[in-house]
Amino acid sequence: MDAKIPPLTPFKKPSGTSLLILLILLLGLLCLGFAQILDLSSISLSLLFPLAVSAICSAILGYVVVPVLRRLKAGQVIQEDGPQTHLKKAGTPTMGGIFFVPVAVIIALIWSKLDPAVLAVSIVTLAYMGIGWIDDWQILRQKSNKGLTPRMKLILQIAIAVGFCIWTFLTQSADLTNIALPGQIILPLGLFFWIIAGFVLVAESNATNLTDGVDGLAGGTGSLAFLGLAALMASNNPGLMIFCACMSGGCLGFIVHNRNPATVFMGDTGSLALGGSLGAIGILSGHVWGLFLVSGIFFVESLSVIAQVSYYKATKGPDGKGKRLLKMAPLHHHLELSGWAETQIVGLFYLINAGLAVLAVISS
């Protein structure tokens, strides 16, 4: 009998609580590190206070909302063709985005004294949350994994993106269309910028949605991404800095309930809101390059799906079947089927995203 070779994984399997502690430490270290990188001694407290308040409020509210979702039987429907280990998660409450996203938005609006930029981004965030809620509700009603049709969801996402781009075009400086790249390179895009802006909003919301497939993954990486953007806002946009810090804290508070084994999932209600929010902030602040870096995990997850589908279609034979690059897309499912534990994947992605946040601040 052949000996079984254990799967190659980067480190021992951590617990969900260990990952929560890791996330808290990473966020704290990033706050301190950003103060040194940007030479702004006050930035640490400016980031930590709204982050902590939002995290605590979201975590506390979760203890009220999660039992309500459970009583309403708002349980997640698990895809049968997904990883078999996920079948045991069937029935776990979903739509968790309804408690941590509004909390973060409300705290940000109050803290920033209804800053116009924060108000605009808040509207986009809640609008994308609304799309996600409709999708989640349809799934729960039909007791299947099919909510809004992909076409209808895309139409709604594009409509919000167009509305936001029109508002930004009418209210912001024309200099916004010049994208700053590393090495003091300025890329003047003119009207083409708005096509990219619309694409970024839609793509970012879908990318975070794809990443939300493992306990603690989308919320934790989202928290780190928002904190990276917050640091980029520190010198010239305190309102958006506060908003990003609050969203980072909201995600952290959600992880209290979503860490492995999760007692609630954010659903499309949360994941679409996170992506739409990140995209809107990156566009409105002019930090498109920084957005690309802090969203590196989301980008790779999306790219893995695109590559999987494209390769399958390109290699399709007479029998209608093609070949697959990955065992399953997105990438986190491929790693699961390769023998990685969920918590190993999440821990590694947290560390990578923290590094990307630092890189974004250094290179912007």
From Swiss-Prot:
<keyword id="KW-0133">Cell shape</keyword>
<dbReference type="InterPro" id="IPR003524">
    <property type="entry name" value="PNAcMuramoyl-5peptid_Trfase"/>
</dbReference>
<keyword id="KW-1133">Transmembrane helix</keyword>
<keyword id="KW-0131">Cell cycle</keyword>
<dbReference type="GO" id="GO:0005886">
    <property type="term" value="C:plasma membrane"/>
</dbReference>
<keyword id="KW-0472">Membrane</keyword>
<dbReference type="InterPro" id="IPR000715">
    <property type="entry name" value="Glycosyl_transferase_4"/>
</dbReference>
<keyword id="KW-1003">Cell membrane</keyword>
<keyword id="KW-0808">Transferase</keyword>
<feature type="transmembrane region" description="Helical">
    <location>
        <begin position="18"/>
        <end position="38"/>
    </location>
</feature>
<protein>
    <recommendedName>
        <fullName>Phospho-N-acetylmuramoyl-pentapeptide-transferase</fullName>
        <ecNumber>2.7.8.13</ecNumber>
    </recommendedName>
</protein>
<feature type="transmembrane region" description="Helical">
    <location>
        <begin position="280"/>
        <end position="300"/>
    </location>
</feature>
<feature type="transmembrane region" description="Helical">
    <location>
        <begin position="237"/>
        <end position="257"/>
    </location>
</feature>
<dbReference type="Pfam" id="PF10555">
    <property type="entry name" value="MraY_sig1"/>
</dbReference>
<keyword id="KW-0997">Cell inner membrane</keyword>
<keyword id="KW-0961">Cell wall biogenesis/degradation</keyword>
<dbReference type="GO" id="GO:0051301">
    <property type="term" value="P:cell division"/>
</dbReference>
<comment type="function">
    <text>Catalyzes the initial step of the lipid cycle reactions in the biosynthesis of the cell wall peptidoglycan: transfers peptidoglycan precursor phospho-MurNAc-pentapeptide from UDP-MurNAc-pentapeptide onto the lipid carrier undecaprenyl phosphate, yielding undecaprenyl-pyrophosphoryl-MurNAc-pentapeptide, known as lipid I.</text>
</comment>
<feature type="transmembrane region" description="Helical">
    <location>
        <begin position="48"/>
        <end position="68"/>
    </location>
</feature>
<keyword id="KW-0573">Peptidoglycan synthesis</keyword>
<dbReference type="GO" id="GO:0046872">
    <property type="term" value="F:metal ion binding"/>
</dbReference>
<dbReference type="InterPro" id="IPR018480">
    <property type="entry name" value="PNAcMuramoyl-5peptid_Trfase_CS"/>
</dbReference>
<feature type="transmembrane region" description="Helical">
    <location>
        <begin position="154"/>
        <end position="174"/>
    </location>
</feature>
<comment type="similarity">
    <text>Belongs to the glycosyltransferase 4 family. MraY subfamily.</text>
</comment>
<feature type="transmembrane region" description="Helical">
    <location>
        <begin position="183"/>
        <end position="203"/>
    </location>
</feature>
<feature type="transmembrane region" description="Helical">
    <location>
        <begin position="343"/>
        <end position="363"/>
    </location>
</feature>
<dbReference type="GO" id="GO:0051992">
    <property type="term" value="F:UDP-N-acetylmuramoyl-L-alanyl-D-glutamyl-meso-2,6-diaminopimelyl-D-alanyl-D-alanine:undecaprenyl-phosphate transferase activity"/>
</dbReference>
<feature type="transmembrane region" description="Helical">
    <location>
        <begin position="91"/>
        <end position="111"/>
    </location>
</feature>
<keyword id="KW-0460">Magnesium</keyword>
<keyword id="KW-0812">Transmembrane</keyword>
<keyword id="KW-0132">Cell division</keyword>
<keyword id="KW-0479">Metal-binding</keyword>
<feature type="transmembrane region" description="Helical">
    <location>
        <begin position="114"/>
        <end position="134"/>
    </location>
</feature>
<dbReference type="GO" id="GO:0008963">
    <property type="term" value="F:phospho-N-acetylmuramoyl-pentapeptide-transferase activity"/>
</dbReference>
<dbReference type="GO" id="GO:0071555">
    <property type="term" value="P:cell wall organization"/>
</dbReference>
<feature type="transmembrane region" description="Helical">
    <location>
        <begin position="214"/>
        <end position="234"/>
    </location>
</feature>
<comment type="pathway">
    <text>Cell wall biogenesis; peptidoglycan biosynthesis.</text>
</comment>
<dbReference type="GO" id="GO:0008360">
    <property type="term" value="P:regulation of cell shape"/>
</dbReference>
<dbReference type="GO" id="GO:0009252">
    <property type="term" value="P:peptidoglycan biosynthetic process"/>
</dbReference>
<dbReference type="Pfam" id="PF00953">
    <property type="entry name" value="Glycos_transf_4"/>
</dbReference>
